[in-house]
Amino acid sequence: MADSQDPLHERTRRLLSDYIFFCAREPDTPEPPPTSVEAALLRSVTRQIQQEHQEFFSSFCESRGNRLELVKQMADKLLSKDQDFSWSQLVMLLAFAGTLMNQGPYMAVKQKRDLGNRVIVTRDCCLIVNFLYNLLMGRRHRARLEALGGWDGFCRFFKNPLPLGFWRRLLIQAFLSGFFATAIFFIWKRL
């Protein structure tokens, strides 16, 4: 049973609840503020992963299957019992769970925002949060979380002043600008 005085338990539960319920909010609902630094960072990192792997994640956007079972299956694949997991694997799992819970415009119109749908979404959020929490706080995965530095380690691992995509675009723009400037200078000298 979870120790209410254990900061890792508390932070893990709060982070998972923040992220899963954030993903499950109805369209046109304002984003609630993140409950912690790691929650803000998780939202940002998962958003980047979902954009980079949009084709994969979009295939699950309209999933009508059992969300909890899908998360369990993905957890079995990503957090294998044969190896220690990495932050990247954990974030991929959370991005997957968030995608399943996403109530994007298409799903909201299809489900007509009725009370029954809201109850099902809330139930699934609670089930997924509890599953992920129990998985991560189990002896094996908790030890790995601690070895990775806990949620402070998560923040250190992913915190960059600017995302990698920004630097790639900047590098490409700088290269192309230099190339075009050289070409224009070369042509101008020839005239």
Curated annotation (Swiss-Prot):
<keyword id="KW-0472">Membrane</keyword>
<dbReference type="GO" id="GO:0031965">
    <property type="term" value="C:nuclear membrane"/>
</dbReference>
<keyword id="KW-0206">Cytoskeleton</keyword>
<dbReference type="GO" id="GO:0005739">
    <property type="term" value="C:mitochondrion"/>
</dbReference>
<dbReference type="Pfam" id="PF00452">
    <property type="entry name" value="Bcl-2"/>
</dbReference>
<dbReference type="GO" id="GO:0042802">
    <property type="term" value="F:identical protein binding"/>
</dbReference>
<dbReference type="GO" id="GO:0043066">
    <property type="term" value="P:negative regulation of apoptotic process"/>
</dbReference>
<dbReference type="GO" id="GO:0097193">
    <property type="term" value="P:intrinsic apoptotic signaling pathway"/>
</dbReference>
<dbReference type="GO" id="GO:0016020">
    <property type="term" value="C:membrane"/>
</dbReference>
<feature type="cross-link" description="Glycyl lysine isopeptide (Lys-Gly) (interchain with G-Cter in ubiquitin)">
    <location>
        <position position="112"/>
    </location>
</feature>
<keyword id="KW-0496">Mitochondrion</keyword>
<dbReference type="InterPro" id="IPR036834">
    <property type="entry name" value="Bcl-2-like_sf"/>
</dbReference>
<dbReference type="GO" id="GO:0005509">
    <property type="term" value="F:calcium ion binding"/>
</dbReference>
<comment type="subunit">
    <text>Interacts with BAX. Interacts with BCL2 and BCL2L1/BCLX. Interacts with APAF1. Interacts with ITPR1, ITPR2 and ITPR3; the interaction with ITPR1 is increased in the presence of AHCLY1. Interacts with AHCYL1. Interacts with HIP1R (via ENTH and I/LWEQ domains). Interacts with CASP9. Interacts with BCL2L11/BIM. Interacts with BIK. Interacts with UBQLN4. Interacts with NME2/NM23-H2. Interacts with PMAIP1/NOXA. Interacts with TPX2. Interacts with UBQLN1; in the cytoplasm. Interacts (via BH1 domain) with BECN1.</text>
</comment>
<feature type="short sequence motif" description="BH1">
    <location>
        <begin position="79"/>
        <end position="98"/>
    </location>
</feature>
<feature type="short sequence motif" description="BH2">
    <location>
        <begin position="144"/>
        <end position="155"/>
    </location>
</feature>
<dbReference type="GO" id="GO:2001240">
    <property type="term" value="P:negative regulation of extrinsic apoptotic signaling pathway in absence of ligand"/>
</dbReference>
<feature type="transmembrane region" description="Helical">
    <location>
        <begin position="166"/>
        <end position="183"/>
    </location>
</feature>
<keyword id="KW-0832">Ubl conjugation</keyword>
<protein>
    <recommendedName>
        <fullName>Bcl-2-like protein 10</fullName>
    </recommendedName>
</protein>
<comment type="similarity">
    <text>Belongs to the Bcl-2 family.</text>
</comment>
<dbReference type="GO" id="GO:2001243">
    <property type="term" value="P:negative regulation of intrinsic apoptotic signaling pathway"/>
</dbReference>
<dbReference type="GO" id="GO:0006915">
    <property type="term" value="P:apoptotic process"/>
</dbReference>
<dbReference type="GO" id="GO:0005783">
    <property type="term" value="C:endoplasmic reticulum"/>
</dbReference>
<dbReference type="GO" id="GO:0031023">
    <property type="term" value="P:microtubule organizing center organization"/>
</dbReference>
<keyword id="KW-1017">Isopeptide bond</keyword>
<dbReference type="InterPro" id="IPR046371">
    <property type="entry name" value="Bcl-2_BH1-3"/>
</dbReference>
<dbReference type="InterPro" id="IPR002475">
    <property type="entry name" value="Bcl2-like"/>
</dbReference>
<keyword id="KW-0963">Cytoplasm</keyword>
<keyword id="KW-0256">Endoplasmic reticulum</keyword>
<keyword id="KW-0539">Nucleus</keyword>
<dbReference type="GO" id="GO:0005819">
    <property type="term" value="C:spindle"/>
</dbReference>
<keyword id="KW-0053">Apoptosis</keyword>
<keyword id="KW-1133">Transmembrane helix</keyword>
<dbReference type="GO" id="GO:0044233">
    <property type="term" value="C:mitochondria-associated endoplasmic reticulum membrane contact site"/>
</dbReference>
<comment type="function">
    <text>Promotes cell survival by suppressing apoptosis induced by BAX but not BAK. Increases binding of AHCYL1/IRBIT to ITPR1. Reduces ITPR1-mediated calcium release from the endoplasmic reticulum cooperatively with AHCYL1/IRBIT under normal cellular conditions. Under apoptotic stress conditions, dissociates from ITPR1 and is displaced from mitochondria-associated endoplasmic reticulum membranes, leading to increased Ca(2+) transfer to mitochondria which promotes apoptosis.</text>
</comment>
<dbReference type="InterPro" id="IPR026298">
    <property type="entry name" value="Bcl-2_fam"/>
</dbReference>
<keyword id="KW-0812">Transmembrane</keyword>
<dbReference type="GO" id="GO:0097192">
    <property type="term" value="P:extrinsic apoptotic signaling pathway in absence of ligand"/>
</dbReference>
<dbReference type="GO" id="GO:0043065">
    <property type="term" value="P:positive regulation of apoptotic process"/>
</dbReference>
